[in-house]
Curated annotation (Swiss-Prot):
Name assigned to this protein: Probable malate:quinone oxidoreductase 1
Pfam families (UniProt xref): Mqo
GO molecular function, one term: L-malate dehydrogenase (quinone) activity
EC numbers: 1.1.5.4
A GO BP entry: tricarboxylic acid cycle
Pathway participation: Carbohydrate metabolism; tricarboxylic acid cycle; oxaloacetate from (S)-malate (quinone route): step 1/1
């Protein structure tokens, strides 16, 4: 039996950081809007946003070498790094606003100051990182970045990485104290608690079965209650699909033209997690290395301090795995079911093009635990097998789409899809994802609430003072805003 509910203004599908962010922004900008949220699991932030299902890095390009490209002439293109840092500044400003206005409390439960570092081995890589730092330090967003090859200084930063190191190859480290570790699961839960207090209806254990456009222009969303097995249809003026890996199959159900010729390739991740508290307590940094030649961007190895429920942890990875599931809690049929007549050529083209990714995944799947530990010892020479365990992180669905130039291009980023009339939006892809959630949701609002957005700008600038500016070009504004953000988020 299917029951029909009255019309609502907004439906958010998925209980992760993206829906939580969009819902919070809408309640700030247009409090009268009626919002409903549907989440398949029993509580919010349990898939991609869960603390163990992502790296928890506040992505700001302070340590991620894959955000800067080296040219053949030795110059370094930092445009992507600067853009990502600017996006993360927007997220931090919004979170600080929510703390300031009493909507988020105890910021240390979701964000911690953790230095961000880069680590390279070999003359060519050392030359690259020197050029990278020299270029970035010209920008105010990276003014605190340090570089060292001095053994004692490096040891003071990360003793575990220097002790026992026998190789004669040169190494270099960068260090930036303004880095952060973010528990996106805890942040998501806090945002949804606040939304419930403001009248947003959040329903858990709800599986969205279908999304169809009506002649009236509204959307019908069919939802199954997983406890009662009852099906209910809801009507809404606007629908946002922010369901992690499930966003692609849900987008395909809408039938909009933007859902055609697009596919997804799932990649799972494994990490080594330290079980020795003495070791954990001797490392305080997120240290990113350089991906191997031919390896995809999500393969960048990193040794990470994490904070979970106030307790420090230490992880190393990721090691790639393969599962046809689009969600950690998904079905083994997800990948097969996502192949449609309109995207089969797209998917096959990607398969032919991305043989290097296939080889990389096969090599990763064949790794033994001893081989994973050998990879860890490149970072931490004295690591002992008995101090580490393997954990499975979340699923990431990399977007495959056609472009004007060619078919089947694998995208390693976050992609916003909107219908022509702006009544539906979907978020696909992976990193930098959650770190840039606020800026991405501003993009959704600009594209989907075109008539209202201009009137919202004064409130937006109250929440995010840098909105409409590039902090890169306004050094004094950056320092003023950063002082405020630091104060409310209690980070450096």
């Amino acid at each position: 039996m299917t029951t029909q509910h009255s019309k609502t203004d907004v439906i958010l599908i998925g209980g992760g950081i993206m829906s939580a962010t969009l819902g919070t922004l809408l309640k700030e900008l247009s409090p009268e809007k009626n919002i409903k949220v549907f989440e398949k699991l029993a509580q919010p932030g349990e898939e991609s946003s869960n603390v163990w299902n992502n790296a928890g890095t506040g992505h700001s390009a302070l340590c991620e070498l894959n955000y800067t490209k080296e040219g053949k002439d030795g110059t370094v293109d930092c445009s992507k790094a600067i853009k990502i840092n600017e996006q993360y500044q927007i997220s931090k400003q919004f979170w600080a606003y929510l703390v300031k206005t009493g909507q988020l409390d105890n910021p240390d439960r979701f964000i911690q100051a953790v230095p961000h570092m880069s680590f390279v081995i070999g003359e060519d890589n050392v030359a690259f990182i020197k050029s990278r730092v020299a270029t970035l330090k010209k920008n105010v967003l990276f003014e605190k970045m340090k570089l060292s090859q001095d053994e004692e200084e490096m040891k003071s930063w990360v003793p575990l990485m220097i002790e026992g190191r026998k190789s004669d190859e040169p190494i270099a480290l960068t260090y930036d104290e303004t880095g952060t570790d973010v528990n996106f699961g805890a942040l998501t839960a806090k945002l949804f608690d606040n939304l419930e207090q403001r009248g947003v209806e959040i329903q858990y254990k709800q599986n969205v079965l279908d999304i169809k456009k009506q002649k009236s222009g509204a959307w019908l969303v069919k939802v199954k209650d997983l406890e009662t097995n009852e099906t209910t249809t809801y009507e809404s003026d606007f629908v946002f699909i922010g369901a992690g890996g499930a966003s692609l199959p849900l987008l395909q159900k809408t039938g909009i033209k933007q859902s055609k010729h697009i596919g997804g390739f799932p990649v799972s991740g494994l990490f080594l997690r330290c079980t020795n508290q003495e070791v954990i307590d001797r490392h305080h940094a997120k240290v990113y290395g350089k991906a191997a030649v031919g390896a995809p961007p999500m393969s960048v190895p990193h040794l990470d301090t994490r904070f979970v429920d106030g307790k420090r942890s230490l992880l190393f990875g990721p090691f790639a795995g393969f599962s046809p599931k689009f969600l950690k809690t998904g079905s083994h049929m997800d990948l097969i079911k996502s192949v449609k007549p309109n995207n089969i050529v797209t998917m096959l083209s990607a398969g032919i093009k991305e043989m290097s990714l296939t080889k990389y995944l096969v090599s990763q799947l064949m790794l033994s635990n001893d081989e994973r530990m050998d990879d860890l010892r490149v970072f931490f020479p004295n690591a002992k097998n008995e101090d580490w365990e393997v954990i499975t992180a979340g699923q990431r669905v990399q977007v495959i789409k056609d472009t004007e130039d060619s078919k089947g291009n694998l995208q390693f980023g976050t992609e916003v899809i909107t219908s022509d009339d702006g009544t539906l939006a979907a978020l696909l892809g992976a990193s930098p994802g959650a770190s840039t959630a606020v800026d991405i949701m501003f993009d959704v609002l600009q594209r989907c609430y075109r008539d209202e957005f201009k009137g919202w700008e004064p409130k937006i600038k109250e929440m995010v003072p840098s909105f409409g500016y590039r902090l890169t070009d306004h050094e004094d504004l950056y320092h003023k805003i950063n002082e405020e953000v630091t104060k409310y988020l209690q980070v450096k």
